């Protein structure tokens, strides 16, 4: 199979929760970062909420009690960033937020067969995810499982070549919004239509489930991913998402 390595398509998980503990004061959860049990992962369950300074201090205290050396946030909208910056968090990544209407969607001609991605396939999906996104941004089995169950309606699909999974997509719908939550393609097989086929399948499913808007995010400087989404009618919103980190092992 002719394949060429291209830059990884890093995508965070809009609309998902990758965590294990629920804080009482606000809707947020704290877990661990994939492959880094010493790094706390904080996710706001309501993307539009603005935490207070006291909320942020409480989360820092929780992470410190759990022995974390750092705490990282999930993707934050601009309005939620202020209290974190005031507490000493710094920016570690910026994500472009893209959307497109789904009132109508005409599926493209299928070039490859898209198959269900089941739990027994997660180990293969993890391999692809880490190879595409690297050890810092790649998901482990638990994180991918969380993504599959993060929305009321979920859709996980893969493409297989010679009995080997070479790409997968995880999609969810909540209300009238569809989220392309994770898209990963083996670096050796990128730019051969695998990602495009998976995006097409995801959008068709969102439309079938009644979503009127589709959303996805990716690294703000990831030109290949931005170009791919542009071909599907996604347009970049004015607001970007950011991920923040606070080192706890250097704080007094």
Q: Which residue stretches match the model-derived regions?
A:
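Conserved GNAT acetyl-CoA-binding A-motif
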Residues: 63-76, 206-218
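Conserved beta-strand-loop-alpha-helix junction that forms the acyl-donor binding cleft
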Residues: 72-80, 216-226, 242-249
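A short beta-loop-alpha structural element at the N-terminal edge
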Residues: 113-125
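A conserved beta-strand-loop-helix scaffold within acyl/acetyltransferase catalytic domains
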Residues: 32-33, 138-162, 166-184
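Conserved donor-binding loop and adjoining core beta-sheet/short helix segment
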Residues: 2-64, 169-181, 186
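Conserved acetyl-CoA-binding loop-helix of GNAT-fold acetyltransferases
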Residues: 50-61, 185, 191-204, 208, ...
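Conserved active-site tyrosine of GNAT-family acetyltransferases
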Residues: 84, 89, 229-230, 234
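Helix-loop element at the rim of GNAT/NAT acetyltransferase active sites that forms part
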Residues: 127-139
């Amino acid at each position: 199979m002719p394949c060429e390595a291209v830059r990884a398509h890093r995508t965070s998980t809009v609309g998902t929760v990758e965590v294990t503990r629920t804080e009482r004061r606000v809707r947020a959860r704290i877990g661990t970062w994939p492959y880094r049990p010493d790094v706390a992962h904080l996710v706001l369950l309501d993307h539009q909420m603005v935490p207070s300074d006291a909320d942020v201090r409480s989360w820092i205290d929780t992470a410190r009690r759990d022995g974390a050396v750092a705490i990282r946030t999930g993707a934050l909208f601009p309005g939620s960033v202020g209290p974190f910056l005031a507490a000493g968090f710094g920016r570690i990544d910026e994500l472009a937020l893209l959307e497109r209407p789904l009132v109508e969607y005409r599926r493209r001609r299928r070039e490859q067969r898209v198959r269900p991605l089941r739990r027994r396939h997660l180990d293969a999906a993890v391999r692809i995810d880490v190879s595409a996104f690297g050890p810092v941004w790649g998901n482990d089995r638990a994180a991918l499982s969380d993504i599959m169950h993060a929305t009321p309606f979920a859709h996980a699909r893969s493409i297989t070549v010679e009995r080997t999974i070479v790409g997968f997509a995880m999609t969810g719908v909540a209300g009238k919004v569809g989220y392309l939550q994770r898209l990963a393609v083996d670096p050796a097989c990128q730019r051969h239509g695998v990602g495009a086929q998976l995006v097409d399948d995801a959008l068709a499913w969102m439309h079938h489930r009644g979503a009127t808007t589709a959303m996805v995010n990716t690294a703000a400087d990831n030109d290949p991913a931005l170009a791919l989404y542009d071909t599907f009618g996604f347009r970049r919103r004015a607001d970007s998402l950011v991920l923040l980190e606070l080192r706890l092992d250097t704080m007094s």
